[in-house]
Amino acid sequence: MEKNPRYVEIDYAKYAPDIPEDQLEAYYGLPKHVQFCNECVMSNQKPNSCYEFEHTINSIKKTMVIQEDGVCDACHACHNKANGHIDWALREKELRELCDQYRKNDGSYDCLVPGSGGKDSFYAAHLLKYKYGMHPLTVTWAPHIYTPWGWENMQAWIHAGFDNYLCTPNGMTHRLLTRLATENLFHPFQPFILGQKQLAPKMAAKFGIPLVFYGENEAEFGNPIADNNSALRDEHFFAVNDYDHIYLGGVSLRQLEEDYKVDKADLAIYLPSETSNLEKNHIQVRYLGYYEKWHPQGAYYYSVEHGGFRPAPERTQGTYSKYNSIDDKIDDFFIKTCFMLQFRDIKRVGQTADIQNKIRLRWDAELEAEGHDCQTHGALRAAVLVEQVADALFVLRGGEQAGIDGII
C-alpha cells in the first residue's frame, strides 16, 4: 500500500477577515449567500441527501431550499403534516391495503425493516407486526463501535419479538474506508451510511422479501419537499447499473484495489444492488412515514413503553436530546464535522421564541459549566435545530398541555 500524504499548503490570505463578501469562495456547491430559515434557523448550507457511492471531494451538493416566504422545505413539510394537508386516515387505509396484499401466512417473512433498535426502527417494526399483522425481518448494519446503550437497545428490539440479522463489516476494510472518508470528504460516517442505505434491499432480494420499510422520508429534514409525495424511496440511493463510477471514501474501486490492495470481495458488502436484481425480485423500498404521522419524540415514548428503550446517559453532542444518534461511539465526531462543514448540527424543523429562550438559558448554563464562553458559542447554539423545540412546537400546535421543562 502506498503512503497517502495529507499535508496541504494553505493559502491563509483566502480567509482574511477583511475580504469583501463578493470575493469569498464557496465550496462544494453550497450557496455563497448564507440564509437562515425564519422558523427553524437551519441554514441553506445544509446539503440534501446524496448518492453516497458517487461522493468525491469534487462533488457539487444540492442544498436545502428556503422558499420565497423565508421558510425552508423542512418546515413546510412539518406544516403540511399538522395543518390538514394530508389525509392520514386515507394514508392508513392505503397501508392496510398494501399489507393485505403482501402479508404471508406460510411462516415466511413478508417485509423487512432495517435499523439499529433505536426509537424509529423499533417503532416501525413494532407497528408493522403488532398493529398491521405483518411478519418483519429486521436487519442491522453494525455501527463502527457500539455504545453500551446502543447494544442494549438492539437486544431489547430483538426481545420485543423480532428476528434479526446483524451485518458487521470486515474491520480492516471498515477502518480504511472510514479513514479515507474522513481525509478525503471529512465524512467519517460514510461507511456506516453506505451500509445503512444498501444492506436492506440486498437482504430483501436474498430472502425474497418484497417490501422494505424505512421510517421518515429525508424530506422531513430538508430534502426537496416534493419527495414526500410518494411512499417509494429513490432507487438510485441503493441500486445501480454501472459499477465503473463508484467511489468509497472518495476513492474509486479501481484505486482501492490497485493502490490500497483491497480485495474485491472485501468491498462487495458496501456496494449497491444491481437494479436488475431488485426488479427481478420485485423489491419495493418504502417510507412508513408516508403512511404514519411520524413524530420523533412520539417514537421515543413508544419504544420506551413497548420495548424498554434506553436513552443515553448524556445528551447527544451539540443537541438537547438523549435518544438521537446514540448507537455509535463516533457519532459525536460526525456531528462536529457536520457543523464545521455546513454550519449545521442535528436537524429539527420548528421553533418558538419562548421555547428557544428557555432552552438557550439552559444551554448557556451547560456551556459555562463546561468552561466555554457563551458569547463565542452563540453561533453554534443558534445553528442547532433541537429535537425538543420541534417536539414542544408539535405539542403546542396540537393544543395539548405540556410544560417545556418536561420536554427538555
Where in this protein do the model-derived segments appear?
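Hydrophobic positions on the alpha1 helix immediately C-terminal to the Walker A/P-loop
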Residues: 123-124
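N-terminal regions of proteins, emphasizing targeting and processing segments when present
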Residues: 359, 363, 388-393, 399, ...
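Residue-level micro-sites within transmembrane alpha helices that shape
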Residues: 119, 386-387
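Nucleotide-activated chemistry modules centered on ATP-dependent adenylation/adenylyltransferase
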Residues: 1-111, 127-371, 381-384
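Short, glycine-rich nucleotide/cofactor-binding loops
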Residues: 111-120
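Residues flanking N-terminal targeting/processing segments that define the start of mature chains
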Residues: 370, 374, 387-391, 406
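Serine/threonine-rich, low-complexity intrinsically disordered segments
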Residues: 357, 378, 404-406
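Short linear motifs in low-complexity or flexible loops
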Residues: 376-383, 390-392, 396, 402
